[in-house]
Curated annotation (Swiss-Prot):
Pathway: Isoprenoid biosynthesis; isopentenyl diphosphate biosynthesis via DXP pathway; isopentenyl diphosphate from 1-deoxy-D-xylulose 5-phosphate: step 4/6. Involved in the biosynthesis of isopentenyl diphosphate (IPP) and dimethylallyl diphosphate (DMAPP), two major building blocks of isoprenoid compounds. Catalyzes the conversion of 4-diphosphocytidyl-2-C-methyl-D-erythritol 2-phosphate (CDP-ME2P) to 2-C-methyl-D-erythritol 2,4-cyclodiphosphate (ME-CPP) with a corresponding release of cytidine 5-monophosphate (CMP). It comes from Leptospira borgpetersenii serovar Hardjo-bovis (strain JB197). Homotrimer. Its EC number is 4.6.1.12. One of its GO terms (biological process) is isopentenyl diphosphate biosynthetic process, methylerythritol 4-phosphate pathway. A divalent metal cation binds at residues 9, 11, 45. This is 2-C-methyl-D-erythritol 2,4-cyclodiphosphate synthase. The keyword Lyase applies. The keyword Lyase applies. Coiled coil: none annotated.
């Protein structure tokens, strides 16, 4: 049995030299950071939501509510690990991941290989099963005004026999 999951996440950008920009588990050099209750890693959030969606288990807000002060600044790798644990408990495994980052800034092209390598490690997938792409909104809307960035992610799960 196969299951497909989709995940979407958006966060605002702010100039904050005291907060790192984290994408796909990688701390990226940038003058901007993402605003969020957690480390605001939009890629790991979208992947986590895609896994939960494929399993019909809701979303990360149910497991990691932004109203819980104990979760303030939580590392999104912990969120992803919990979602992978739920997946394995149900005897599924990840087949592939396809992520698209949307925004004008920061430029993703110079970061893609680091992010992809991190995702391969975190997800225990080979390089040819992880895709990281980027696009812009051609300066339209909030993302075009560099107020934030987002990620769309699609994953495929297969049930282990």
């Amino acid at each position: 049995m196969y299951r497909i999951g989709n995940g979407i996440d958006f966060h605002r950008l702010e100039i904050n030299p005291n907060r790192p920009l984290v994408l796909g588990g990688v701390e990226c050099e940038s003058e901007v950071a993402l605003v969020g209750h957690s480390d605001a890693d939009i890629i790991l959030h979208a992947i986590s939501d895609a896994i939960l969606g494929a399993l019909a288990l809701g979303d990360i807000g149910q497991y990691f509510p932004d109203t819980d002060p104990k979760l303030k600044n939580i590392d999104s790798k912990i969120i992803l690990a919990k979602c992978l644990e739920l997946m394995k408990e149900r005897n599924f495994q990840l087949v592939n991941v396809d992520c698209t980052v949307i925004g004008e800034k920061p430029k993703i092209a110079p970061l893609k290989e680091k992010i992809k390598k991190s995702l391969c490690s975190l997800l225990d997938l080979p390089v040819d099963c992880v895709s990281v792409k980027a696009t812009t909104t051609e300066k339209m809307g909030a993302l075009g005004r560099q107020e934030g960035i987002g990620t769309f992610c699609t994953i495929l799960l297969v049930k282990n026999l």
